[in-house]
């Protein structure tokens, strides 16, 4: 499994993927953040937060949304008055959060497809980029359909991730560095360790790993020459 460098909630917040008047949604993504991320939001400037998140890509790939995101951040810092008359700002928003995550979420290597890229090719490419293992060392298990993780995000929209089951030799060597900009840590874990490390509210992800575990215990894996 891999651990993201930044929590999903933090990335959504810095990118300004919300309406400042949708308090409940903003509260939901704040509750997904780590304690360190919450502290940084209160103590650092938006420019510092933006540069830290995107690194060398800060002025290129997401330039179009930077100013919009900054305006929302400053609006909340100065205070927002809801239509109900209730007011809040960044400080009250963070202080009302009841979560205390120490690390960002753990999950599986995945990502978006490139233009005209097939699902399977995307899966192999993302695995190589995010783990450092050569994708050619992977052996796909062909007679198992992809596992689909369908879930409702904090924005109440439906999303679907598709995972392909593959395996590699025990003595496979990780030759390349994984994407440090997106991946903070990586571990080979047992089924129990996976279940323990996945956040409790990520029920769909827990269901995926349980289904994989059941498949591996109920069926024999055979090499086909």
PLM region descriptions:
Residues 1-80:
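Internal, charge-rich low-complexity segments
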Residues 8-9, 53-56, 61-216, 220-225:
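Unchanged
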């Amino acid at each position: 499994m891999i651990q993201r460098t930044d929590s999903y909630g933090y990335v959504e917040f810095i990118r300004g993927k919300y309406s400042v008047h949708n308090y409940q949604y903003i509260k939901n993504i704040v509750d997904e953040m780590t304690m360190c991320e919450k502290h940084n939001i209160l103590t650092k400037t938006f420019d510092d937060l933006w540069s830290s998140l995107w690194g060398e890509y800060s002025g290129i790939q997401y330039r179009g949304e930077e100013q919009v995101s900054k305006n929302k951040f400053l609006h909340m810092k100065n205070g927002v008055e809801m239509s109900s008359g209730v007011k809040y700002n960044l400080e009250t928003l963070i202080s009302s959060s009841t979560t205390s995550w120490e690390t960002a979420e753990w999950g599986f290597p995945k990502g978006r497809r490139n233009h005209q890229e097939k699902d399977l090719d995307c899966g192999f490419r993302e695995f190589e980029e995010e783990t450092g293992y050569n994708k050619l060392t992977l052996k796909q298990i062909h007679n198992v359909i992809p596992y689909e993780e369908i879930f409702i995000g904090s924005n109440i929209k439906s999303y679907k991730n598709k995972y392909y089951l593959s395996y590699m030799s025990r003595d496979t060597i990780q030759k390349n560095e994984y994407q440090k900009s997106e991946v903070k840590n990586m571990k080979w874990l047992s089924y129990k360790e996976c279940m323990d490390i996945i956040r409790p509210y990520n029920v769909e992800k827990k269901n995926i790993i349980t289904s994989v575990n059941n498949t591996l215990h109920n069926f024999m894996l055979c090499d086909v020459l």
